[in-house]
Regions:
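Glycine-rich, acidic/polar active-site loops that bind/position phosphate-bearing ligands
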Residues: 1-314
Length: 314
Protein backbone atom coordinates (compact mmCIF):
# COMPACT_ATOMS: atom_id res chain seq x y z
CA UNK A 1 0.00 0.00 0.00
CA UNK A 2 1.18 3.52 -0.79
CA UNK A 3 -1.00 5.21 1.85
CA UNK A 4 1.13 4.14 4.82
CA UNK A 5 -1.20 1.34 5.89
CA UNK A 6 0.24 -2.00 6.94
CA UNK A 7 1.34 -4.14 3.96
CA UNK A 8 0.63 -7.85 3.54
CA UNK A 9 3.39 -10.22 2.35
CA UNK A 10 2.82 -11.59 -1.16
CA UNK A 11 3.30 -15.15 0.12
CA UNK A 12 3.86 -17.13 3.31
CA UNK A 13 6.80 -19.15 2.05
CA UNK A 14 10.13 -19.55 3.82
CA UNK A 15 13.82 -19.98 3.14
CA UNK A 16 14.52 -21.82 -0.15
CA UNK A 17 10.82 -22.69 -0.46
CA UNK A 18 9.98 -24.08 -3.92
CA UNK A 19 6.34 -25.02 -3.46
CA UNK A 20 4.08 -24.32 -6.47
CA UNK A 21 1.92 -21.83 -4.57
CA UNK A 22 4.98 -19.66 -3.95
CA UNK A 23 4.34 -16.53 -6.04
CA UNK A 24 8.02 -15.71 -5.82
CA UNK A 25 9.04 -18.50 -8.20
CA UNK A 26 7.32 -16.93 -11.20
CA UNK A 27 8.32 -13.45 -10.07
CA UNK A 28 12.00 -14.40 -9.92
CA UNK A 29 11.83 -16.25 -13.25
CA UNK A 30 10.32 -13.26 -15.06
CA UNK A 31 12.63 -10.77 -13.35
CA UNK A 32 15.79 -12.75 -14.10
CA UNK A 33 14.78 -13.23 -17.74
CA UNK A 34 14.35 -9.47 -18.08
CA UNK A 35 17.64 -8.71 -16.32
CA UNK A 36 19.64 -11.11 -18.46
CA UNK A 37 18.04 -9.73 -21.64
CA UNK A 38 19.51 -6.38 -20.54
CA UNK A 39 22.99 -7.86 -20.06
CA UNK A 40 22.84 -8.13 -16.25
CA UNK A 41 23.94 -11.60 -15.16
CA UNK A 42 22.33 -13.35 -12.20
CA UNK A 43 24.24 -16.00 -10.24
CA UNK A 44 21.63 -17.27 -7.77
CA UNK A 45 18.05 -16.73 -6.73
CA UNK A 46 15.76 -18.22 -4.09
CA UNK A 47 13.07 -17.38 -1.57
CA UNK A 48 14.53 -15.84 1.57
CA UNK A 49 13.53 -16.41 5.19
CA UNK A 50 10.69 -13.92 5.55
CA UNK A 51 7.25 -14.17 3.90
CA UNK A 52 7.35 -12.52 0.48
CA UNK A 53 11.11 -11.98 0.69
CA UNK A 54 13.16 -12.84 -2.40
CA UNK A 55 16.92 -13.01 -2.92
CA UNK A 56 18.48 -12.44 -6.34
CA UNK A 57 22.29 -12.32 -6.45
CA UNK A 58 23.94 -10.35 -9.24
CA UNK A 59 27.21 -11.50 -10.79
CA UNK A 60 30.24 -9.48 -9.77
CA UNK A 61 31.57 -6.53 -11.78
CA UNK A 62 33.65 -3.44 -11.06
CA UNK A 63 32.21 -1.09 -8.43
CA UNK A 64 30.67 1.46 -10.81
CA UNK A 65 29.13 -1.17 -13.10
CA UNK A 66 27.73 -2.97 -10.06
CA UNK A 67 26.13 0.23 -8.79
CA UNK A 68 24.61 0.82 -12.24
CA UNK A 69 23.33 -2.77 -12.30
CA UNK A 70 21.77 -2.38 -8.85
CA UNK A 71 19.82 0.70 -9.92
CA UNK A 72 18.58 -1.07 -13.06
CA UNK A 73 17.80 -4.16 -10.98
CA UNK A 74 15.56 -2.17 -8.64
CA UNK A 75 13.58 -0.69 -11.52
CA UNK A 76 13.15 -4.13 -13.10
CA UNK A 77 11.94 -5.63 -9.81
CA UNK A 78 9.34 -2.93 -9.37
CA UNK A 79 8.14 -3.21 -12.97
CA UNK A 80 7.79 -7.00 -12.84
CA UNK A 81 5.98 -6.74 -9.50
CA UNK A 82 3.46 -4.27 -10.93
CA UNK A 83 2.83 -6.58 -13.88
CA UNK A 84 2.07 -9.38 -11.42
CA UNK A 85 -0.23 -7.28 -9.26
CA UNK A 86 2.09 -6.95 -6.26
CA UNK A 87 4.46 -4.27 -4.99
CA UNK A 88 8.22 -4.71 -4.68
CA UNK A 89 9.98 -2.74 -1.97
CA UNK A 90 13.60 -2.29 -0.98
CA UNK A 91 12.64 -0.87 2.41
CA UNK A 92 15.19 -2.36 4.85
CA UNK A 93 12.60 -3.67 7.33
CA UNK A 94 8.94 -3.41 6.29
CA UNK A 95 7.71 -5.91 8.92
CA UNK A 96 8.65 -5.66 12.58
CA UNK A 97 8.07 -9.39 13.13
CA UNK A 98 10.16 -10.58 10.16
CA UNK A 99 13.82 -10.21 9.13
CA UNK A 100 14.82 -7.18 7.09
CA UNK A 101 16.45 -7.08 3.67
CA UNK A 102 20.18 -6.55 3.30
CA UNK A 103 22.48 -5.82 0.38
CA UNK A 104 25.38 -8.06 1.35
CA UNK A 105 28.30 -7.02 -0.82
CA UNK A 106 31.22 -9.27 -1.77
CA UNK A 107 34.33 -7.41 -2.86
CA UNK A 108 37.93 -7.98 -3.90
CA UNK A 109 40.76 -5.56 -4.69
CA UNK A 110 42.88 -6.12 -7.79
CA UNK A 111 46.29 -4.86 -8.88
CA UNK A 112 46.14 -5.50 -12.61
CA UNK A 113 45.14 -9.15 -12.93
CA UNK A 114 46.31 -10.07 -9.42
CA UNK A 115 43.86 -10.36 -6.55
CA UNK A 116 45.46 -8.22 -3.84
CA UNK A 117 43.38 -9.94 -1.15
CA UNK A 118 44.94 -13.36 -1.80
CA UNK A 119 48.12 -14.68 -0.20
CA UNK A 120 48.97 -18.36 -0.27
CA UNK A 121 49.70 -19.88 3.12
CA UNK A 122 48.34 -17.00 5.19
CA UNK A 123 45.41 -17.39 7.57
CA UNK A 124 42.25 -17.81 5.46
CA UNK A 125 44.52 -17.11 2.43
CA UNK A 126 43.99 -13.42 3.26
CA UNK A 127 46.86 -11.04 2.41
CA UNK A 128 48.21 -8.15 4.48
CA UNK A 129 46.40 -5.81 2.08
CA UNK A 130 43.16 -7.68 2.69
CA UNK A 131 43.61 -7.58 6.44
CA UNK A 132 44.32 -3.84 6.43
CA UNK A 133 41.34 -3.25 4.14
CA UNK A 134 39.05 -5.01 6.61
CA UNK A 135 40.63 -3.05 9.47
CA UNK A 136 39.77 0.16 7.63
CA UNK A 137 36.17 -0.93 7.18
CA UNK A 138 35.89 -1.72 10.89
CA UNK A 139 37.59 1.44 12.14
CA UNK A 140 35.37 3.70 10.06
CA UNK A 141 32.17 1.60 10.11
CA UNK A 142 30.29 3.80 12.57
CA UNK A 143 31.08 7.11 10.86
CA UNK A 144 30.06 5.84 7.40
CA UNK A 145 26.84 4.21 8.64
CA UNK A 146 24.69 7.20 7.70
CA UNK A 147 25.68 6.49 4.09
CA UNK A 148 25.64 2.69 4.09
CA UNK A 149 22.40 2.66 6.12
CA UNK A 150 20.80 5.95 5.21
CA UNK A 151 17.18 5.59 6.28
CA UNK A 152 15.35 5.84 9.60
CA UNK A 153 14.11 2.33 8.90
CA UNK A 154 17.65 1.03 8.28
CA UNK A 155 18.30 0.84 12.02
CA UNK A 156 15.14 -1.20 12.62
CA UNK A 157 16.84 -3.88 10.50
CA UNK A 158 20.17 -3.57 12.32
CA UNK A 159 18.65 -3.55 15.80
CA UNK A 160 15.35 -5.38 15.15
CA UNK A 161 14.68 -7.67 18.10
CA UNK A 162 12.82 -10.30 16.08
CA UNK A 163 16.00 -10.97 14.12
CA UNK A 164 17.65 -12.30 17.27
CA UNK A 165 14.95 -14.85 18.02
CA UNK A 166 15.35 -18.50 17.09
CA UNK A 167 14.16 -19.27 13.59
CA UNK A 168 13.67 -15.64 12.57
CA UNK A 169 16.46 -15.96 10.04
CA UNK A 170 17.73 -12.40 10.48
CA UNK A 171 21.41 -11.85 9.79
CA UNK A 172 21.88 -8.08 10.05
CA UNK A 173 25.11 -7.17 11.88
CA UNK A 174 24.71 -4.96 14.94
CA UNK A 175 28.33 -4.93 16.09
CA UNK A 176 31.62 -3.91 14.49
CA UNK A 177 33.75 -7.01 14.08
CA UNK A 178 34.93 -9.49 11.49
CA UNK A 179 35.05 -13.26 11.34
CA UNK A 180 35.64 -16.27 9.15
CA UNK A 181 32.29 -17.56 7.92
CA UNK A 182 30.64 -15.75 10.86
CA UNK A 183 27.29 -14.39 9.74
CA UNK A 184 26.85 -12.31 12.88
CA UNK A 185 29.95 -10.26 11.98
CA UNK A 186 29.89 -7.00 10.04
CA UNK A 187 32.64 -8.29 7.73
CA UNK A 188 32.83 -11.97 6.85
CA UNK A 189 35.74 -13.75 5.16
CA UNK A 190 34.17 -16.55 3.10
CA UNK A 191 35.82 -19.95 2.89
CA UNK A 192 38.60 -20.02 0.27
CA UNK A 193 38.21 -22.55 -2.54
CA UNK A 194 41.57 -24.05 -3.60
CA UNK A 195 42.69 -22.88 -7.02
CA UNK A 196 40.24 -19.96 -7.05
CA UNK A 197 42.72 -17.17 -6.26
CA UNK A 198 40.69 -14.67 -8.25
CA UNK A 199 37.64 -15.23 -6.07
CA UNK A 200 39.34 -14.54 -2.71
CA UNK A 201 37.12 -11.87 -1.22
CA UNK A 202 35.40 -10.37 1.78
CA UNK A 203 31.70 -9.80 2.43
CA UNK A 204 30.35 -6.59 3.97
CA UNK A 205 27.01 -7.42 5.59
CA UNK A 206 25.85 -4.09 7.00
CA UNK A 207 24.52 -2.51 3.80
CA UNK A 208 20.76 -2.65 3.38
CA UNK A 209 18.59 -2.92 0.32
CA UNK A 210 17.69 0.78 0.32
CA UNK A 211 21.25 2.12 0.21
CA UNK A 212 22.45 4.43 -2.57
CA UNK A 213 25.02 2.07 -4.13
CA UNK A 214 27.19 4.84 -5.59
CA UNK A 215 27.65 6.60 -2.27
CA UNK A 216 27.80 3.41 -0.21
CA UNK A 217 30.46 1.78 -2.39
CA UNK A 218 32.47 5.00 -2.44
CA UNK A 219 32.54 4.91 1.36
CA UNK A 220 33.46 1.22 1.53
CA UNK A 221 36.38 1.81 -0.82
CA UNK A 222 37.48 4.95 1.02
CA UNK A 223 37.41 3.25 4.42
CA UNK A 224 39.14 0.10 3.21
CA UNK A 225 41.83 1.90 1.24
CA UNK A 226 42.48 4.20 4.21
CA UNK A 227 43.30 1.07 6.16
CA UNK A 228 45.65 -0.13 3.41
CA UNK A 229 47.39 3.23 2.99
CA UNK A 230 47.97 3.68 6.71
CA UNK A 231 48.68 0.03 7.47
CA UNK A 232 45.86 -0.52 9.96
CA UNK A 233 46.26 -3.65 12.06
CA UNK A 234 43.34 -6.05 11.98
CA UNK A 235 41.99 -6.91 15.44
CA UNK A 236 41.35 -10.56 16.33
CA UNK A 237 38.40 -12.11 14.56
CA UNK A 238 35.14 -13.07 16.26
CA UNK A 239 34.10 -16.64 15.65
CA UNK A 240 31.32 -16.78 18.26
CA UNK A 241 27.75 -15.68 17.66
CA UNK A 242 28.27 -12.00 18.50
CA UNK A 243 24.54 -11.46 19.13
CA UNK A 244 24.60 -14.13 21.86
CA UNK A 245 27.46 -12.50 23.79
CA UNK A 246 26.82 -10.23 26.75
CA UNK A 247 27.75 -6.54 26.60
CA UNK A 248 30.63 -7.26 28.97
CA UNK A 249 31.92 -10.07 26.74
CA UNK A 250 31.77 -7.85 23.67
CA UNK A 251 33.58 -5.03 25.48
CA UNK A 252 36.30 -7.46 26.57
CA UNK A 253 36.77 -8.41 22.91
CA UNK A 254 36.90 -4.75 21.83
CA UNK A 255 33.67 -5.06 19.85
CA UNK A 256 31.70 -1.81 19.58
CA UNK A 257 28.08 -1.42 18.40
CA UNK A 258 26.94 0.27 15.23
CA UNK A 259 24.87 3.45 15.69
CA UNK A 260 21.48 2.79 17.28
CA UNK A 261 19.57 5.09 14.95
CA UNK A 262 19.92 7.52 12.06
CA UNK A 263 20.39 10.46 14.44
CA UNK A 264 23.47 8.86 16.03
CA UNK A 265 24.81 7.94 12.61
CA UNK A 266 24.44 11.51 11.33
CA UNK A 267 26.26 12.93 14.35
CA UNK A 268 29.21 10.63 13.66
CA UNK A 269 29.14 11.38 9.94
CA UNK A 270 29.16 15.14 10.55
CA UNK A 271 32.43 14.79 12.50
CA UNK A 272 34.06 12.54 9.90
CA UNK A 273 36.86 13.92 7.74
CA UNK A 274 36.83 10.67 5.76
CA UNK A 275 33.18 11.02 4.72
CA UNK A 276 33.55 14.73 3.96
CA UNK A 277 36.64 14.17 1.80
CA UNK A 278 35.12 11.19 -0.03
CA UNK A 279 31.73 12.72 -0.83
CA UNK A 280 32.99 16.23 -1.48
CA UNK A 281 31.63 19.42 0.06
CA UNK A 282 28.46 19.70 -2.05
CA UNK A 283 27.24 16.11 -1.63
CA UNK A 284 28.33 15.97 2.02
CA UNK A 285 26.39 19.12 2.95
CA UNK A 286 23.31 18.21 0.90
CA UNK A 287 23.20 14.68 2.28
CA UNK A 288 23.46 15.90 5.87
CA UNK A 289 20.74 18.54 5.44
CA UNK A 290 18.42 16.08 3.76
CA UNK A 291 18.90 13.33 6.33
CA UNK A 292 18.72 15.66 9.34
CA UNK A 293 15.37 16.87 8.02
CA UNK A 294 14.18 13.27 7.70
CA UNK A 295 15.34 12.46 11.22
CA UNK A 296 13.63 15.52 12.73
CA UNK A 297 10.40 14.69 10.90
CA UNK A 298 10.54 11.14 12.26
CA UNK A 299 11.25 12.31 15.83
CA UNK A 300 8.11 14.45 15.82
CA UNK A 301 5.90 11.69 14.39
CA UNK A 302 3.36 10.09 16.75
CA UNK A 303 3.66 6.41 15.90
CA UNK A 304 1.18 3.55 15.93
CA UNK A 305 3.27 2.03 18.74
CA UNK A 306 2.66 5.06 20.98
CA UNK A 307 -1.04 5.13 20.20
CA UNK A 308 -1.40 1.41 20.88
CA UNK A 309 0.61 1.46 24.12
CA UNK A 310 -0.24 4.84 25.58
CA UNK A 311 -3.60 6.07 24.34
CA UNK A 312 -5.75 3.53 26.25
CA UNK A 313 -3.94 3.92 29.58
CA UNK A 314 -2.77 7.53 29.82
Amino acid sequence: PLDGSRPTPADNSGYFDHTPQNIGMDFRRQAITMLESMGISVEFSHHEGAPGQQEIDLRYADALSTADNIMTFRLVMKQVALEQGVQATFMPKPFSEHPGSGMHTHLSLFEGDRNAFYESGSEYQLSKVGRSFIAGLLKHAAEISAVTNQWVNSYKRIWGGSERTAGAGGEAPSYICWGHNNRSALVRVPMYKPGKTGSARIEVRSLDSGANPYLAYAMLLAAGLKGVEEGYELPPGAEDDVWALSDAERRAMGIEPLPQNLGEALTLMERSDLVAETLGEHVFDFFLRNKKSEWEEYRSEVTAFELRKNLPVL
